[in-house]
Design a protein with these regions (language model features):
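NTP-dependent nucleotidyl-transfer catalytic core
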Residues: 1-258
Length: 258
C-alpha cells in the first residue's frame, strides 16, 4: 500500500522513471480498450485521462492558496468553502485526490471544449463525490456551464452480489461478451449473426432496467429466444417485416391511428 502511494506521488511529481513506466502501461491499456470498444461498435472522438490534465493542476493549486480559497490543515489542502465533510484537494504528502484530477479535467475542457453542459455518466455510488465536485466548480468559479451526474446501478449476479466470474474475479466486459457468444453459438452457428445478437443482448440488458437501479445479469434469461429479451424483439421485427413483404402493400405510406 505504501509503495503504491509513493509511486502515485512520484507520478504527480513527474518523475522520469515512473512516467516512462506509466507510458508503457498506458499505451497497452488504451489500445486494448479501443480494440474492445471497436468490437462492440462503440467509438469516441477523444480518449483522455488524468495524464492529459495533470499539468494544469499545480497552477490551480497556487491560485486557490493565493486567493485564500483553500487552507492547509496538518499539511493537507482543504477547500475553504465550508463543506461537510471537507473537500480535500491534496493530501499532506502533496499527492492528488480524485477531486483534484476531476477539477483538472474541468480546467482542460473549459480551455478546449467550452461546452454548455457537462454530463458525467458514472456509477450511482459516486453521487456524493460529484455533489462535492460541482459545489467546488461554483466556489472556485471554474465554469458557468451546467454540470450533471447521470448515475447508473451496478450489474449483479443471481444472488444480488456484484457480478463476478466463476473464479471470483471481476467480470471484464470482453469476458462477458465472449460468454454471451458461447451461449448463443449453441442455437446459431453463424458467427456474424452471433456477434450481432451478442451486442443486442448487452445493450438490451442495460436498457430494459431502471437506469439508477441495480440489476441481475442472468445469461440464460437475456439470451432466451422467447419472452422479454433482445433476441425475441429482433425475431419479432424480422417476422413483422416478412409479413409486410408478403402482403405486397407499400407500407411506407401506412398510417398508425388509435
Amino acid at each position: 500500500y505504501k509503495t503504491a502511494l509513493n509511486i502515485s506521488k512520484e507520478l504527480n511529481l513527474r518523475k522520469e522513471k515512473r512516467i516512462n513506466q506509466w507510458k508503457t502501461i498506458y499505451d497497452i491499456s488504451t489500445k486494448n480498450i479501443v480494440s474492445i470498444l471497436d468490437d462492440l461498435d462503440f467509438y469516441f472522438d477523444n480518449y483522455l485521462g488524468e495524464s492529459d490534465v495533470i499539468l494544469l493542476i499545480p497552477d490551480f493549486i497556487e491560485f486557490i492558496k493565493k486567493e485564500n480559497l483553500a487552507v492547509l490543515d496538518d499539511g493537507a489542502l482543504i477547500a475553504n468553502d465550508g463543506q461537510d465533510p471537507p473537500a480535500l484537494i491534496t493530501k499532506s504528502d502533496g499527492s492528488y485526490m480524485y477531486l483534484t484530477t476531476d477539477i483538472g479535467t474541468i480546467l482542460y475542457r473549459e480551455k478546449n471544449f467550452k461546452a454548455d453542459k457537462y454530463i458525467y455518466v458514472v456509477d450511482e455510488r459516486q453521487k456524493n463525490h460529484f455533489n462535492q465536485l460541482f459545489k467546488l466548480v461554483e466556489f472556485f468559479d471554474l465554469s458557468q456551464s451546467e454540470f450533471l451526474h447521470i448515475g447508473f446501478g451496478t450489474v449483479n449476479d443471481k444472488n444480488g452480489n456484484p457480478l463476478k466470474t466463476r473464479d471470483g474475479e471481476n467480470y471484464k466486459l470482453l469476458q462477458l461478451f465472449t460468454d454471451i457468444q458461447k451461449q448463443l453459438s449453441e442455437i446459431n452457428s453463424d458467427e456474424k449473426t452471433v456477434k450481432m445478437l451478442s451486442k443486442s443482448v448487452l445493450t438490451y440488458s442495460d436498457l430494459v432496467t431502471k437506469r439508477t437501479g441495480n440489476y441481475v445479469f442472468d445469461l440464460e434469461k437475456f439470451t432466451n429466444t422467447s419472452g422479454k429479451s433482445a433476441i425475441f424483439i429482433q425475431y419479432s421485427q424480422v417476422r413483422a417485416k416478412r409479413l409486410l413483404e408478403q402482403s405486397n402493400i407499400n407500407y411506407q405510406f401506412l398510417t398508425v391511428s388509435g
